[in-house]
Each structure stands twice: as structure tokens, then as C-alpha cells.
């Protein structure tokens, strides 16, 4: 698997179940995004995972129920290649990979009320204060995720970083309804679903936290 373009010739394109969304590009709107029905060849519900890593978690979810379509968003091409390999090895047909930044994909190519569920698994916490502007859970992007959820849709975050968790909950409380009682998170012991990052942090003895928020009527 290779990138379908040289850097100087980069442009959004879809090939072999991968949607390539290049960085530092100014003509996103020129690409005509196919409908979800055209991409998945069905009208089934769609769920989206952000920060998919090597794809262990999302491939497992896609295999559990073939009637549910999944989108895996991962910005690193080396990881996208691993997800793509797993798709082929397990013959997964209900998964689309997005190779690019989540914010760019959502703002330019995801229409309102597209997703039943959005799951953000172990995002980079950007712990240094001067780097916090790079965090996913900021007002503008949380509003964009809310926009793309159906009414009753769910936004889930799993992380090993407690401070990141608390900050993300603070932002989500502005726009969504908590699905868990205060303090709005749980400590995940098991049964979350395997992923490379989850296994890594558990092997280091770190706790795994999970929070869930719901889009209510009128939001």
C-alpha cells in the first residue's frame, strides 16, 4: 500500500476503502464527497472512531456486527497501512479508513447527523501547556462532533490521562448531556475492547478512564 500521490500533487481522493485527506491543502471544497450510501453500498448506521492507531479496536467492532458501518480516522500513514492490512486479513467490508486530520475531515466532509456514535480512543493528551492548542477536545471541534451526531447519538472518550479526561469533560458539558452520573466517568477494568494503546498503558500499570455524552433533542 502506497500513498496515491506525491506531496506536490496531493489532493483528496478515495482508493481501496481509504479516503486520503492531505494536510496543508487549500482546495478541499473542490472534492465531491460521495454519499455514505455510495461508500458503504448500504443504508446502515455509521459509527466513527478517532485516533484509530493500528486498528485493533475498530476492526474488532466492525467484525462484531456487519450491519453497522465504521469509519476509522488516523492521521499517520504507517498506522493507516496497518489498519488496511487488517481489513484485508479479516475480510472486513463495513469499514472506511480516513487518512488525515480528524478536524479537517469533519469540517469539510461530514454532513449533519451522520453518526450514531463517535469514539475517541486514547488521543494525544499534549500535556505541556504550550501544546494544549493541539488537543482534540476544544470547543470548536466538540461542536463539530456534536453537529455530526444524530439525536440520541453518543460521544465516547477513552484515555489514560486523568487531567485530559477532566478537561475534555468540562468542554463536553457545554454542548452535550452526560451519559454517566457525576463525576461523569468510570474506571474501565476490562471488556472495553483491545487496542495497542490500551494494552500499552495497562502494561505500565496505568488506569483507563471512559466518559460518555449524549446529543439530546434540541441540541
Swiss-Prot record:
It comes from the Bacteria. SUPFAM superfamilies: S-adenosyl-L-methionine-dependent methyltransferases (SSF53335). One of its GO terms (molecular function) is tRNA (guanine(46)-N7)-methyltransferase activity. Coiled coil: none annotated. Substrate binds at residues 128, 160. It is an enzyme of class 2 (transferase). Transmembrane segments: none annotated. It catalyses: guanosine(46) in tRNA + S-adenosyl-L-methionine = N(7)-methylguanosine(46) in tRNA + S-adenosyl-L-homocysteine. Pathway: tRNA modification; N(7)-methylguanine-tRNA biosynthesis. PROSITE patterns: SAM_MT_TRMB (PS51625). Its EC number is 2.1.1.33. Keywords: Methyltransferase, S-adenosyl-L-methionine, Transferase, tRNA processing. Signal peptide: none annotated. One of its GO terms (cellular component) is tRNA methyltransferase complex. S-adenosyl-L-methionine binds at residues 49, 74, 101, 124. The active site is at residue 124. Belongs to the class I-like SAM-binding methyltransferase superfamily. TrmB family. Catalyzes the formation of N(7)-methylguanine at position 46 (m7G46) in tRNA. PANTHER family: 3-DEOXY-D-MANNO-OCTULOSONIC-ACID TRANSFERASE/TRNA GUANINE-N 7 - -METHYLTRANSFERASE (PTHR23417), PENTACOTRIPEPTIDE-REPEAT REGION OF PRORP DOMAIN-CONTAINING PROTEIN (PTHR23417:SF14). This is tRNA (guanine-N(7)-)-methyltransferase. It comes from Chlamydia trachomatis serovar A (strain ATCC VR-571B / DSM 19440 / HAR-13).
